[in-house]
Structure formats: C-alpha cells, structure tokens
Amino acid sequence: MPLLDSFTVDHTRMEAPAVRVAKTMNTPHGDAITVFDLRFCVPNKEVMPERGIHTLEHLFAGFMRNHLNGNGVEIIDISPMGCRTGFYMSLIGTPDEQRVADAWKAAMEDVLKVQDQNQIPELNVYQCGTYQMHSLQEAQGIARNILERDVRINSNEELALPKEKLQELHI
C-alpha cells in the first residue's frame, strides 16, 4: 500500500494550532491544488469533541470561504480528520501559510458570533447525516481555544520522519 503524505511527518513533534502545507499538485490543465493540514489539537494529546467538531464542520467551511476565497484562491473542500485533531482543506491556488492562518483566525471569530444553534447551516434531517449530533457550545469552545493559543506554522522539513525511522516502522 502506498504511504500517504500525512504519515511521513512526525506527529510527536507537531505543534497546534498550526497550518501546514500537506500536499501540492497540478491538474492536467496546470491549475495548482494545495492541501492544508489545519491542526487544531496536538496529536495524541488532545482531541476535539465529536459534537463540537461536527458543528464546526458546518460553520468553518463557509466562514473560511468568506475570508480566503479570491485573489487566485478557491476552496474546494474542508473536512475533519478522522483522528479529530484537525481539518484538511483542499483548494485551488497556492496561498501562503500566513494568509491561511489569518483566515482561520477570522473564521474562529465568526464562530464565536453565532448566537443560536438554529443558525448552524444545513442543520436538518435532509442535509446532514447526523443532524442531532451538534453542539454550538463545544464548537465555540474549540474556536476560543484556537484564538487564545494563536495559529503557528508547521514546517514539513522540520517534521519529516527520517527514512531510517520509516524503515524501522516497516513502512
């Protein structure tokens, strides 16, 4: 099985909250696609609560588009990681990490402005697979945590697992 890019970085040295370019590629037509690791929690030490991350998924995608789309950037998708320590964001374009970090912080400010659970987009049986599994309070707690700790940049070069370690892990 091919080794995914996300498993070539040392999760024990990852900082959070932090932005990292997880992957860059070009389409056959030459469009640049960038995938960002938006790490909300320190791996293996913190985890986002399931209701909070689900609510954040509904809010975050729209708020990030408001703050990041434009000037050669268009978000394709923002999805939570299965480990519940962050989100992956795929987009057209190549914004630098600081631009992404600034948009992320602005989106977290927007999450704090949501006053009622009824303002969560697509919160209904028709548009959400588990529409009863939400918590605005938990999502706002996550947002506050990000803003209090600020957003840093994780460098692939600093986090790269040495080839010897990958061999030792039988990868």
Swiss-Prot record:
Catalytic reaction(s) noted: S-(5-deoxy-D-ribos-5-yl)-L-homocysteine = (S)-4,5-dihydroxypentane-2,3-dione + L-homocysteine
Transmembrane segments: none
Species assigned in the record: Escherichia coli O7:K1 (strain IAI39 / ExPEC)
Functional note: Involved in the synthesis of autoinducer 2 (AI-2) which is secreted by bacteria and is used to communicate both the cell density and the metabolic potential of the environment. The regulation of gene expression in response to changes in cell density is called quorum sensing. Catalyzes the transformation of S-ribosylhomocysteine (RHC) to homocysteine (HC) and 4,5-dihydroxy-2,3-pentadione (DPD).
Gene: luxS
Enzyme Commission designation: 4.4.1.21
Cofactor: Fe cation
A GO BP annotation: quorum sensing
Cofactor note: Binds 1 Fe cation per subunit.
Source taxon at top rank: Bacteria
Record protein name field: S-ribosylhomocysteine lyase
